Amino acid sequence: MSPSRFAEITSRYPQLRIAVVGDFCLDRYLEIDPARAEVSIETGLPVHNVTRVRSQPGAAGTIVNNLVALGVGEIVPVGFCGEDGEGWELRRALRGLRGVTLEHFIQTTERSTFTYTKPLIVECDAIPRELNRLDIKNWTPTPAPLRARLADHVRALATAVDAIVVMDQVSIDETGVVTAPVLAMLGEIAAENPGLPILADSRRGLRDFPAVTFKMNANELATLTGAVSADPAAAAAGLARERMKPVIVTLAERGVLGALPSGETVSVPVLPVRGEIDVVGAGDAVTANAAAALAVGASLGEALVIANAAASIVIHQLGTTGTASVAEIGRILN
């Protein structure tokens, strides 16, 4: 991609309005100094002393973080949090992000705030080491009135945004934001607005999703299509033809692959790796960057070149779920 074409695409990002529909969580990092370790007088067990606490939006919030880093003009989260301390922290973190508006983000006593608490051993000149994670999640189905409210919020944004990103993060069916009513509404919107980019990613798989652009990894592609082969391009092309929507597949060390309903495929090789890496957040960087580029009219191939470069930046950011700015991506590509 030429520098002028990259500039042409990314210069339009400030005019975009993108909705992010899905499971927002609080990523809370507890930085532990091992030099301050103690032993509990009461129990005799080791005590980890936390010297710093930092939080940021995670899951669907990671998509938001990436869109903010790209300079997207307005980002509209559609989701929920609880009436709890974690929910207060999550809303504060989202409000503090440039361009994020919360009129479609619901706070409710009927749900707990989805939370990842990540203890990190932090030593001077060493890579942070994560201990066992502590999660807070919802184990019961999302109440029907809340599901209906969320679907209504999605409907309200259908003709008011330039793209929709759907992030289904929860592992238990119907306990999060992306429930049957929301999926049905997304299907209606996709049918009524064929030119609107709608990108979807799901931890539980995309089998029950309507005809929108699918983003997945190679294992998820194999599970969905039943095509366990060394040629993911053929499987992706078949899926794109069947669904009549583009398909995006991340291939780890092999880069990223895209397929169009015509059967045409594009493959973008991975960029060189420099030192230690952490792949957490790389897939979300691909999703966010592809959505922004497609929303301003980039081709699928152009969108994936940008998205692949963003992922190559994010994997080098250790001890956090990283992002990539337009300037950083431009330096990688040029």
Regions picked out by a protein language model, each given a short descriptive name:
Residues S171-T265, P269:
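Conserved phosphate/ATP/ADP-binding segment of small-molecule kinases
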Residues E242, L271-I332:
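Conserved post-catalytic alpha-helical subdomain immediately downstream of the catalytic base
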Residues F24, Q169, A285:
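Active-site metal-binding loops of divalent metal-dependent hydrolases
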Residues C81-R98:
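A glycine-rich beta-to-alpha transition motif near the start of alpha/beta enzyme domains, typified by
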Residues A93-E110:
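A glycine-rich helix N-cap at a beta->alpha junction
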Residues F105-A158:
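Conserved phosphate-binding/catalytic loop of the ribokinase/pfkB sugar-kinase fold
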Residues A160-T175:
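Short acidic, glycine-rich surface-loop motifs adjacent to enzyme active sites
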